[in-house]
């Protein structure tokens, strides 16, 4: 048969009520749109597994080919190094190798938990990460919402360019500028003095370390982080805005009742990812900014691991600390994912 039919029961499968099917194309569980679209969809069938695999390869082979470099990357740089995690349970000696080193069980974990530094570095890590989530996570969402309300396209592009640029500035340069601005005669103190305040070397005072660190992180990442939310906003149904305007809703009401709910799934996914790395505080900026005066509040798990492992050559101990860090991250990831499912109905898994 080669005559065309229209079936309302199949319309929802293609999302197009004008799609045309051919009965000859439905044999074996396959149906097609008409020749104008040349797109194929599949219905459940009873074909052998080998045949289904072959058909899937024929239709998606280029996707699989493009996926190969990604798989290789994760195998080489993520999964293969996992073999070295075993040294967290051994007294590793380079001359004996991983398998030849003495097994000590949870000794390094016990030493870490009993260390006088444990409470301090854990407190600092949670403080910096918590402040980053509290102030840094909503910042790109707010910027995306504000950019979406700008109707002047040239001005909008200028704002986007200005906010995106800091992401591409080298971290060393940013830290160098911060150190210069925070001097007693630097830019920040000049502004403080202009408003009647007293000057002080800001990076030498521990109470200013967190605001400087978190503020610079927000400044550097707010523009780049807003891109994904702008993309999510672009996917919100425009008919909802038109209906809201007809009902007399203003921009603020549209933002609150249409835009935010429309991007909530994206927000929750990003929140889960952020919570999954709650203890992964970037140590590079901290290493470049902290000093003996701020060491008490700036030392975190990542800098502690760096100091113990690379500077102190305590490879097994630092691996145990890193493994503890990963275990805590997994727990927070699972909790955040469950919370996301309750709030938005979707999660990472």
Language-model regions, residue ranges each:
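Intrinsically disordered, low-complexity repeat segments enriched in small/polar residues
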Residues: 5, 21-25, 66
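Small/flexible residues
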Residues: 8-9, 34-35, 181, 276
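Targeting/processing segments of secretory and organellar proteins
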Residues: 1-3, 7-8, 28
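Acidic/proline-rich low-complexity IDRs
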Residues: 9-13, 20-22, 42, 201-202
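Short, Lys/Arg-rich, polar N-terminal cytosolic tail immediately upstream
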Residues: 27-56
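Short, Lys/Arg-enriched N-terminal segments with co-localized hydrophobic residues
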Residues: 12-35
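A structural signal for multi-pass alpha-helical bundles of membrane permease subunits
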Residues: 41-43, 55-349
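N-terminal intrinsically disordered, low-complexity tails enriched in polar/charged
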Residues: 2-5, 15, 40-43
């Amino acid at each position: 048969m080669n005559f065309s039919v229209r079936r309302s029961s199949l319309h929802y499968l293609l999302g197009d009520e004008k799609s045309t099917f051919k009965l000859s194309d439905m044999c074996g569980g396959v149906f097609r749109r008409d020749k104008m679209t040349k797109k194929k969809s599949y219905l459940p069938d009873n074909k052998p597994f080998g045949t289904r695999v072959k058909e899937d390869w024929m239709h998606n082979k280029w996707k699989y080919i493009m996926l190969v470099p990604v798989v290789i990357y994760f195998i080489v740089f993520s999964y293969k190094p996992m073999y070295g995690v075993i040294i967290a349970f051994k007294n590793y000696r380079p001359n004996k190798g991983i398998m030849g080193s003495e097994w000590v069980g949870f000794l390094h974990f016990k030493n870490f938990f009993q260390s006088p530094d444990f409470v301090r570095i854990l407190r600092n890590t949670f403080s910096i990460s918590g402040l980053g989530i509290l102030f840094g996570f909503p910042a790109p969402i707010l910027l995306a919402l504000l950019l979406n309300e700008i109707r002047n396209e040239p001005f909008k592009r200028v704002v986007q360019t200005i906010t995106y640029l800091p992401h591409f500035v080298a971290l060393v340069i940013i830290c160098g500028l911060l150190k210069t601005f925070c001097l007693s005669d630097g830019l920040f103190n000049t502004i403080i003095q202009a408003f009647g305040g007293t000057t002080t070397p800001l990076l030498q005072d521990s109470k200013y370390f967190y605001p400087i660190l978190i503020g610079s992180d927000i400044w550097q990442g707010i523009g780049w982080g807003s891109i994904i939310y702008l993309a999510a906003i672009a996917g919100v149904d425009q008919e909802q805005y038109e209906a809201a305007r007809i009902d007399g809703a203003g921009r603020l009401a549209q933002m609150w009742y249409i835009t935010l709910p429309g991007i909530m799934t994206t927000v929750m996914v990003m929140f889960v990812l952020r919570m999954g790395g709650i203890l992964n505080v970037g140590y590079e900026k901290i290493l470049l900014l902290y000093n003996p005066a701020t060491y008490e509040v700036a030392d975190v798990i990542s800098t502690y691991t760096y100091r113990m492992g690379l500077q102190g050559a305590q490879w097994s101990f630092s691996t145990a600390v890193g493994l503890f860090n990963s275990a805590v991250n997994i727990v927070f990831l699972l909790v955040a994912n469950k919370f996301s499912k309750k709030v938005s109905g979707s999660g990472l898994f």
